[in-house]
């Protein structure tokens, strides 16, 4: 691996891209009002002083602001990519040059380099891990068990990662507590529902220049991401079709006014397909074979296993690359979850935890403050009524 010319150990495309990255980071920061508030508190209180953090996240301008916030809270932070395709090389360069944050990420890096970068991040001997898909935690528990002793806790950002970590906890192999940031109500609201919904539509349109109005838009999965995507696709004029394996979510989709059917049925009808399930083989060779000529297939889940890419490769007569892009959202829950883990790790078990309700509500309150919105508070009389049982109708 190559390293940058700075003394800070990193592996990036090159520091010559840092000027553009610096502008991107500053631009993203303007719209991250909640993180700005948290960063000011972190600078003042230094809650992460002495902590080493290894973060395996999308290396984007938004994530850069999270890393800067953690550093300003006293942490020693290194960052590696959770997805080789999402890395913004200019942002990585600016983090190294301008913010003294170690980065191991190069856009489009091959599989070997990707995992070598995770190993390099673990050489940092972290006290806290931050993950987006649980690859770093998995490597730590399998190939780098020597680095486990100093770890006091971690956070996980995605549904896919939380599923993997809960499986590890169930088997008794998870060696430290993890806060599932993905399960926070504010994360569902800002990131999964509204963030993923908008950014997925934006990505499809930017890549294809396809007119959604009047098209049949098939969405596999009606979780938080699927709901947000369905809402945005309908808003763009598409006829939305939902496929699901969970009867409750399928019923919810139907009651929300969407057509619900199996993927086998939907494959024959759709103009655009998007998988948001967190599972594998959602769109298979059999589905692809019956799709319309020119159908658009996309995935907004974390890994690329939801679509049978190997089968698609074999069926394709040629390939052509179009434009690349990515958007990321809200990191307030991540930063506060790290602070929570540092303060409470000694009392936590080796399992996956939800974000504490008081922390989640704090993020919501900070967001409302940043928007200039005020809400009512319960009166003492109302609090007493809610807590009691003797007063009836």
Give short role names for the model-derived ranges.
Residues 2-48, 79-215:
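Glycine/serine-rich phosphate-binding loop and adjoining beta1-alpha1 elements at the start
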Residues 52, 67-86:
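Active-site cofactor/substrate anionic-group-binding motifs, chiefly glycine-
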Residues 17, 55, 130-131, 274-275, ...:
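Redox-cofactor binding/interface segments in oxidoreductases and associated redox assembly factors
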Residues 121-122, 265-266, 290:
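Structural alpha-helical scaffold elements that stabilize or flank donor/cofactor-binding regions
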Residues 2-9, 17-34, 48-52, 56, ...:
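Adenosine-phosphate binding glycine-rich loop
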């Amino acid at each position: 691996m190559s390293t940058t010319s700075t003394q800070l150990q990193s592996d990036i495309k090159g520091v010559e891209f840092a000027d553009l990255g610096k502008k991107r980071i500053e631009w993203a920061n303007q719209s991250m009002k909640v993180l700005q508030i948290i960063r000011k508190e972190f600078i003042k209180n230094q809650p992460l002083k002495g902590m080493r953090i290894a973060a395996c996240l999308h290396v984007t301008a938004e994530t850069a602001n999270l890393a800067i916030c953690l550093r300003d809270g006293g942490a020693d932070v290194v960052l590696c990519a959770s997805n080789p395709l999402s890395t913004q090389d200019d942002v990585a360069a600016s983090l190294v040059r301008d913010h003294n944050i170690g980065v191991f990420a190069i856009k489009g890096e091959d599989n070997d380099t990707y995992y070598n970068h995770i190993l390099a991040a673990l050489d940092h001997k972290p006290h806290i891990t931050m993950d987006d898909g649980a690859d770093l935690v998995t490597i730590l528990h399998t190939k780098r068990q020597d680095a486990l002793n100093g770890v006091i806790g971690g956070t996980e950002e995605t549904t896919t990662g939380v599923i993997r970590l809960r499986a590890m906890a169930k088997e008794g192999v998870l060696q430290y507590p993890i806060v599932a940031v993905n399960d926070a109500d504010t994360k569902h609201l800002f990131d999964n529902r509204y963030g993923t919904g908008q950014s997925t539509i934006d990505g499809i349109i930017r890549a294809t220049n396809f007119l959604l109005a009047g098209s049949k838009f098939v969405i596999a999965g009606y979780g938080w991401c699927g709901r947000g995507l369905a809402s945005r696709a309908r808003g763009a004029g598409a006829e939305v079709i939902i496929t699901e394996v969970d009867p409750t979510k399928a019923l919810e989709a139907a009651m929300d006014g969407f057509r619900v059917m199996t993927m086998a049925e939907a494959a024959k009808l759709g103009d655009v397909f998007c998988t948001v399930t967190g599972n594998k083989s959602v769109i298979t060779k059999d589905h692809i074979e019956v799709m319309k000529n020119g159908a658009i297939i996309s995935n907004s889940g974390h890994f690329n296993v939801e679509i049978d890419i190997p089968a698609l490769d074999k069926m394709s007569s040629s390939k052509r690359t179009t434009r690349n892009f990515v958007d990321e959202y809200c990191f307030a829950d991540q930063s506060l979850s790290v602070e929570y883990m540092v303060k409470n790790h000694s009392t936590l078990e080796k399992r996956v935890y939800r974000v504490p309700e008081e922390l989640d509500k704090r993020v919501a309150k900070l967001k409302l403050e940043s928007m200039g919105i005020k809400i009512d508070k319960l009166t003492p009389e109302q609090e007493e009524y809610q807590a009691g049982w003797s007063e009836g109708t």
